[in-house]
């Protein structure tokens, strides 16, 4: 008999542009007799649960509609939760993409007798899986399946013999953990921090400008001239902090489809040109963290596709994360805390008892997971500099990031009692390290040491500035990962300017030799720059 094996699980993730708007560019067989509506009066933005329409003919709560025309303007499918006749449709999950005014909303065929399947469900014509990314070489996942708060109530005088009288449903929470995975590229780094911009080296081909605004959530757009643009090449749109690189999937006249939606808005007439490696990815802080979706596919031992158990978690944020490495090992990361707004899955159930709130979604589709072929970042390839001094004998280090996320539960019409939103609290950074002491020096030497810096408390001639930290991993030519503290690389006195401070640096006496110091460091911000051959970062 076939069984579900943990070593046959596929895990992948994708970014979200609007909270809860998972990116699933799917299409299905249209129901010719059921054109539900047409969006005409407004655009529909990523993260919206409700879209405006000019009609709701044949709209039925619980049925599915495809938003967008296959191979033309990008498509996705959502389930109708409610509607206002002739005005709007509200879905069970937020939409993931940007949709122009006038986009067709079409009912799609489903088979709900026993299988709960959707007829003709597949990827949209001119794109790729948008939830295809893997964070690295991982081994275990604490899956964010819902935790149900069932609350017993004790009433006086009901003859319950000290037992609770009745149990009531409370809130649902979803939180997962992906621990101790080896970094193979910089994909997962931005999610506990903020945004990413990507630039490439100009290839000398395909130079043009954008024709019309590109909105976050689009994966098709117009340019003034498509001359020199070829499918499977890479295109950079915009420059500086707004630059994004995407793979060209299809070119039709001056219209271009790319492999992944844009995460940022881009103004009309900005530059777009074909680029090649190396690519430089700059990760900078943002007040609001990027959203993230996870998908887990449990395959059985016979690898029978119809037995795949798919679970998709959306509306997530990475609340706590660590970066760690130790001698003889590799650079590893953990997403320590990842709360989500909700989930769906492909386990069909039409029973009256469980179907109303079981989170089934017929649009669940297995993705082809993209697995990097790059080497890890080895500890031996790293270097750490603090207060201008490179430390050659670092035994281990850990960088901690805490966003103090708080899921909130507001009044809503949903019966699921899941979080309404997840808000960021104060951001906290810290770093710990074990550093073997350098060769002995005369007590009169002027060399800066951990002990001296501890006593200095970051207070120098220029004021209470703290100090800089530079952490660099070099895998090869044009292949580096650089973490800089503070984010602009220059510590200075005053608010929003300081660098790092040593809170403790204990050099204890033990049986281990040579002597080492356990360092605890506080800092207020950082920036990360990754140079590699990966063009598209989620």
Question: Residue ranges of each PLM-predicted region?
Answer:
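Signature of extracytoplasmic/envelope-associated structural regions
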Residues: 1-44, 48, 58-82, 86-538
